[in-house]
Amino acid sequence: MNLEETMPLVFERSIPGRIGFSLPESDVPETKASDYFEQAYIRSVPADLPELSELEIMRHYTNLSNHNFGVDSGFYPLGSCTMKYNPKINEKVARFPGFANIHPNQPESSVQGALELLYDLQTSLVEITGMDEVTLQPAAGAHGEWTGLMLIRAFHEKNGDTKRTKVIIPDSAHGTNPASAAVAGFDVVTVKSNEKGLVDVADLKKVVGEDTAALMLTNPNTLGLFEKDIVEMAEIVHEAGGKLYYDGANLNAIMAKVRPGDMGFDVVHLNLHKTFTGPHGGGGPGSGPIGVKKELIPFLPTPVLTKKEEGYTFDYNYPDSIGRVKPYYGNFGINVRAYTYIRTMGPDGLKLVTEYAVLNANYMMRKLQEAYDLPFDQVCKHEFVLSGNRQKKLGVRTVDIAKRLLDHNFHPPTVYFPLIVGEAIMIEPTETESKETLDSFIDTMLKIAKEAEENPEIVQEAPHSTYVKRLDETRAARKPILRYQKEV
């Protein structure tokens, strides 16, 4: 039975005339919309909204939520997404009246506590990353990437170095890296990976030149491998006059152990909604702060939060700033959660996060390599990439394995990424999962590998137990239906 057979759309449940609210008679004169808006902006007919009782609304969305899956539901090993548990103390603090009930248009003097939290969070992130200054304005990871690249662009233009139009990106990089570079107005140059899954330094030397604006790197990279030649790569890029950009997607693998700033990076962006336990996976909100070294501080987006004798204030006096990149001052609620997490864990706790994240990933990798191909057989960091090529020869593809995991109440790992690995299966267990959970997932993956050999049809036709079976994902991506259209 499919979900659409048991759960109609909320529009399809609608009964004309049914209401879910009652209001007292208005005690002020009624006015017409035409008194305030031009006729072009006024509906000619009422909006076709669902008409339901409050109880029907509650049941509809509660039932929908029961078919959803999140970190609180089960294991979510989505590689490169750091789907760790989000401590509920974060939610409690974010709901403090002094945080939840304030408005960004209030006078600075009335929100000094909130500004102090933001300033302290900036200071903590400076220490964690090894940068000299941090802005909390960017709203998410890719937004942070773009902001950091715009700073680099502004830096080069300020120095009259307008020929630097190219950003170098590894072939194993996140897809957002080349996209962000292109949106920032740069041309993308790809540097190859070597046989060990690391940046090929010899190839980097070939592509670096006077037109290089920056090299974007994730370290550890998207294969979960630490770029051991990072210091040499930094020297190569800096000698050519370029900047080194750190994609902080994988900071969970090195946090409180090593710092991007100490490796030679000039700009970093962080994903507070990932590494620092803001809830994510539902489309937002996120938080993608960037940190910079001293020579890039003048180009930070304004306003810049500063501390003076009289208190905390926003400084707009940055004539070389790239300007605002978001209304107001970032996604405050996610920043509160990240601050709470950092203060709760402390330096020693953050170090343990890294150690357990790396331990869990290596434990799983060694347990699974007997049944799946391991393209790069070496110690990994927080995540690792398997290949389903062995199963593909039996007629079972990686997408089939992912769908079969749904029958066992596991969210699938990231699949078919990074692109340099055929039939890729990228697994990131995070530090918050127990050995029992890891073992259960391992056993299931081994069982699926055995099914691929002995009964491939059961894997090829999965999932069997979910309300929604296989969707036409290609059609959904290319011809999405984004709004309800009533049948006439």
From Swiss-Prot:
Matching CDD domains: GDC-P (cd00613)
EC number: 1.4.4.2
Short name of any one Pfam family annotated for the protein: GDC-P
Keywords: Oxidoreductase, Pyridoxal phosphate
GO cellular-component term (any): glycine cleavage complex
Lineage: superkingdom: Bacteria
GO molecular function: glycine binding; glycine dehydrogenase (decarboxylating) activity; pyridoxal phosphate binding
InterPro entries in UniProt: GcvPB, GDC-P_C, GDC-P_N, GDC_P, PyrdxlP-dep_Trfase, PyrdxlP-dep_Trfase_major, PyrdxlP-dep_Trfase_small
Family according to the record: Belongs to the GcvP family. C-terminal subunit subfamily.
Functional summary from the UniProt entry: The glycine cleavage system catalyzes the degradation of glycine. The P protein binds the alpha-amino group of glycine through its pyridoxal phosphate cofactor; CO(2) is released and the remaining methylamine moiety is then transferred to the lipoamide cofactor of the H protein.
Subunit comment: The glycine cleavage system is composed of four proteins: P, T, L and H. In this organism, the P 'protein' is a heterodimer of two subunits.
Protein name according to UniProt: Probable glycine dehydrogenase (decarboxylating) subunit 2
